[in-house]
Design a protein with these regions (language model features):
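A short, well-structured alpha-helix characteristic of acyl/acetyltransferase catalytic modules
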Residues: 1-54
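Acetyl-CoA-dependent GNAT
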Residues: 24, 45-96, 104
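Short, hydrophobic secondary-structure boundary micro-motifs
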Residues: 38-41, 71, 132
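Active-site catalytic microenvironments for nucleophilic, acid-base chemistry
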Residues: 62, 121, 125
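Conserved acetyl-CoA-binding loop-helix of GNAT-fold acetyltransferases
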Residues: 107-121
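Conserved GNAT acetyl-CoA-binding A-motif
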Residues: 125-133
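Conserved small/polar residues in nucleotide/adenosyl-binding loops
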Residues: 134-139
Length: 141
């Protein structure tokens, strides 16, 4: 695996880019404060925008490490989600992905489009051999 870090990715409808602490309000409003949207992520729903700002501060610091792969997902000028490599198994060159999208953007194919783009990036640029992604039927409930 090549440790190339988080670079911008463009799809037909979306832009994936690094997080900024300035993204805190949108992240909080659009997904981080929603108990349903955050039900399956590794961090709890945020009680206020300060909690989101604190999380983003850590994520932004993490970009100093080229093993960090963590994107904000943008539709036009709006943050609609997040996707990241949450674990790496170097023995088998495997990257595990996790993602979260605001409920307003469920069932429009944005998660599928995002996952495909990130998997292409990981296979082609970072030279990962395998990707693992757990999904749920939460959007269908």
């Amino acid at each position: 695996m090549k440790l190339v870090g988080t670079r911008p990715i463009h799809t037909d409808r979306l832009v994936l880019r690094r997080w900024s602490v300035d993204d805190a309000q949108q992240m909080y409003d659009n997904l981080a404060s929603d108990t349903e949207a955050t039900r399956f992520v590794t961090w709890p729903p945020h009680p206020n925008v300060d909690a989101t700002r604190l999380l983003l501060t850590g994520w932004v610091r993490g970009y100093d490490d080229p093993a960090t792969f963590n994107w904000a997902v943008w539709l036009d000028e709006v943050i609609i989600g997040q996707i990241a490599v949450v674990d790496v198994d170097t023995r088998v060159n495997l990257a595990e992905l996790g993602y979260c999208f605001g409920r307003r953007w469920w069932n429009h194919g944005y998660a599928t489009e995002t996952v495909k783009a990130v998997m292409s990036y990981l296979f082609d640029i970072a030279q990962v051999n395998n990707c693992l992604l757990y999904t749920s039927d939460a959007a269908d409930e």
